[in-house]
Amino acid sequence: MNINAYDFDVIKLLVIKDWQIYQKQLASYVVGLLIGLTLVGMGKAWSFYVGALLLLVLLICAGVFAIQSSVLNERKEHTLPFVMSLPVTPMAFYWSKLLANVSIYLVPFTLVVAGTAFLVLFTPLPDGLLVWSLLIYGFLAMIYFVSLGAALVVESEGWNTFVMIALFTMVSPFIMGVGMIDAIGTNIKTNNIVWSPPAVGIFLAEFAVIALVIGVTSWIHRRKTSFL
């Protein structure tokens, strides 16, 4: 990683700075997600669909807002001269942005995943929803990492916006497509938690894409000798 002890201290300070900027917005997203989980757990058809939609929308918005606040807006506001004045290498700055964004996103993401698992396992909701839900959340995490990776290496705001829109328009087709796979869809309304080969394959593919994004973006920044 080519990062020394001093870089770790700088990374920590930059991560804390991003957290301080985002904490109020993060709190509002957490409140909204708790409302969504409450609606899902009410056990009524209308509240389930409204709550599920709210969870998806807020989870997407939380990720997009984090990327725009800590990466795209800083670039748009021409903070590069300030960054160059800091005693930080391009690699350390990359890791600070990656860790800040991932740690921020993990708060709403973990809340939704844990909350969904609890509701599925301990309420009358069919247990078969668990695998389907985890695959959807894994897909959301995957496209978040791809969007973040693009923001970290592509300077054009237009291209970053295009990437985000293109990725998030794939959410609905993915949800429907996964549900149409027999090994997955046939268990959704049952109490059977089945990790079928297609489900495991999709889950592993999502993690592979995330690992690939981190590997490629870190390699690109490792080759940089300056911010220019």
PLM region descriptions:
Residues 1-78, 92-228:
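Hydrophobic alpha-helical transmembrane segments of membrane proteins
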